[in-house]
Amino acid sequence: MAVDVDEAWTVPPGTQTFTIERSLPTQIERLTIVGAEGGWELVDLIVGQRRLLPEGPILVRGAGGQVKLQPHFGIDKSNPLEMVVRNPGSEDMHLVVSTRSRALTS
C-alpha cells in the first residue's frame, strides 16, 4: 500500500542538507518539492553513496515552483535520502516535501 507523507522545512539563506529517513526499508515512488518563495535550487539528492541528480543542480523559479521526480529508490535507517537545497535569498524560505512511498516486504 502506498503512503503519502508531507514534511515542511524552513530553509535559512545558504545551502542546507535535510534528511528523510524511514525505520523500515521503503521504496520512494514519487518526490515533490514545493518552495513557497521563488528562486531556490535543488543542489543534490543522495542515497547512501549514490547521487540522484547526475545532470547537476535544478534551479526552481517563481513562487510555488516545484520539482517532481519519480526516482524509484529505496531508503531505510542506514541509507536515508539527503536533500541539499540552496536558498540564495536573504530571508528564510519554506519548502514542503511530499513523498509517495511503499514499504518493502521481504
PLM region spans:
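Beta-strand-centric surfaces of beta-sandwich/beta-rich domains
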Residues: 1-106
